[in-house]
Amino acid sequence: MSRKKTPKSKGASTPAASTLPTANGARPARSGTALSGPDAPPNGPLQPGRPSLGGGVDFYDVAFKVMLVGDSGVGKTCLLVRFKDGAFLAGTFISTVGIDFRNKVLDVDGVKVKLQMWDTAGQERFRSVTHAYYRDAHALLLLYDVTNKASFDNIQAWLTEIHEYAQHDVALMLLGNKVDSAHERVVKREDGEKLAKEYGLPFMETSAKTGLNVDLAFTAIAKELKQRSMKAPSEPRFRLHDYVKREGRGASCCRP
């Protein structure tokens, strides 16, 4: 398989069409989409050669667009920086304005998978901007802050928005972030699990500060999308829920 390469610098995405999960409703399997040639339609795969942040060149076999969504202040930018750079953004909180993105290439079972990860603004005034970016997303990580009950209560509103603007087969995962702040926790783990079960979503708790489950969340999504786009007929189906439960349990000893 010949690998594509892209120079790293900032870029933009192109919108497309939609639908999604309902409480206790079945969700169809997503056939993940790899990058294809420059003649692909605007609502189709990401394009090879699309610029990304940083210097140097990324070599990859397939690429997918992953969006982080949720209320302002839930830690989307910190989670992304932790995964991309292995660092924690401590200090003054600065809200994302509009939308931004970073790229990272993972080795998934011998396949170079490029994740183009979009960090969205959670404030209401930027919603019309972020709506357009839902449409060609292959996966969405929906975050709430375990120390902020309102951000958890708003998850259903986010799911309604996703249902309206995202593709019906988008890969979706629910993340309860900031579990390092145990003394400030107001949303129990069981509440997150219950909501995720109601909507049929994989779920885990994360910490951008300690790194708990951050790599796991993105790796699980990369595995799911890679298999959707490249699964051989004889290859067993990758089960995202089972993988998250199995691998997440190994990190339980580190939970605050």
Curated annotation (Swiss-Prot):
Biased composition range(s): Low complexity: 12-23
Keyword line: Cytoplasmic vesicle, Golgi apparatus, GTP-binding, Hydrolase, Lipoprotein, Magnesium, Membrane, Metal-binding, Nucleotide-binding, Prenylation, Protein transport, Transport
Enzymatic class: hydrolase
Essential cofactor(s): Mg(2+)
Family annotation (Pfam families): Ras (PF00071)
Its job: The small GTPases Rab are key regulators of intracellular membrane trafficking, from the formation of transport vesicles to their fusion with membranes. Rabs cycle between an inactive GDP-bound form and an active GTP-bound form that is able to recruit to membranes different set of downstream effectors directly responsible for vesicle formation, movement, tethering and fusion. RAB26 mediates transport of ADRA2A and ADRA2B from the Golgi to the cell membrane. Plays a role in the maturation of zymogenic granules and in pepsinogen secretion in the stomach.
Notes concerning its domains: Switch 1, switch 2 and the interswitch regions are characteristic of Rab GTPases and mediate the interactions with Rab downstream effectors. The switch regions undergo conformational changes upon nucleotide binding which drive interaction with specific sets of effector proteins, with most effectors only binding to GTP-bound Rab.
UniProt protein name: Ras-related protein Rab-26
Gene source species: Homo sapiens
Phylogenetic lineage: Eukaryota, Metazoa, Chordata, Craniata, Vertebrata
